Amino acid sequence: MILVTCDDGIESPGLRAAVRAVLPLGDVIVSAPCEQQTGAGRSLPTFNDGAIHEVEYEVDGHRVPAYAIHGSPAQAVLYALVELVPYRPVLCVSGINFGANVGSGVTASGTVGAALEAADQGVPAMAVSLETDKKYHYNHSEEVDFSAATHFTRCLAARMLVRQMPADVDLLKVEVPCDATPHTPWRVTRLSRQRYFRALPTGRRSLAEKRRLDYEMVIDHATLEPDSDIQALLVERVVAVTPLSLDLTSRVALEELEAQLR
């Protein structure tokens, strides 16, 4: 069984594209937030009531068991694993997200957060995002073409089902350019240390005025790592496949750091 989720919510065309990608690979179950949860990261908020609603879900003539969760993307995964699936899934696919998730800000991504939660529960996982214009980041536009992202989701999911990942690879983060085709090359990258999404001042006239943070996307080409996800996706225009680990420990020599701190 393959579990599919998406932080953009149960109505997202990207979620439907992910389901379409993995339908030929095995039984599929969908568990996704009932509403848009972009930026939720791996959060497990206590204010969500956890209600679960079974929904009618059909993709290409196939009826798929699907559930809308009053919760975050990570909670949608947890509810699926403890209450909805009859046995442990062999794979969790989170996506396909509207907009790239690259650089140092990926911990804020609900797409990545859901995949991290699945991985922490022992389920191999992948988080898939499609680069889109900023205007599509928070909506369910049917204008966005997910066909190439669907292709790469299917190809990489198929590989994950038959090939065991190395011990330190808990999930794959897949970034697909907006102009990709099934013939676009892909390569394995590292996570850039650059902050791609940068917050902007709200322009509020008083602190009490209600304003949401806006953001811009910025690349510092002078310091951009040549083997990074940002370089591959946004400069070279290839699909970036980044192995991520649940182990967030710094790669510094621990003995040296301890000596420095004492």
Regions found by a protein language model. Name each.
Residues 8-13, 206-208:
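Short acidic, Gly/Ser-rich segments with clustered Asp/Glu that frequently serve as metal-coordination loops
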Residues 80-86, 113-124:
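Alpha-helix C-terminal capping segments
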Residues 90-99:
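Short acidic, glycine-rich surface-loop motifs adjacent to enzyme active sites
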Residues 2, 18-83, 87-88:
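A cross-family phosphate/adenosyl-ligand binding-site feature
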Residues 29-31, 67, 93, 124-128, ...:
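Hydrophobic/aromatic beta-strand patches that form the interior of the parallel beta-sheet core
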Residues 100-109:
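Glycine/threonine-rich flexible loop motifs
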Residues 144-262:
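Electrostatically charged, flexible surface regions
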Residues 119-141:
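Glycine-rich phosphate/pyrophosphate-binding loops
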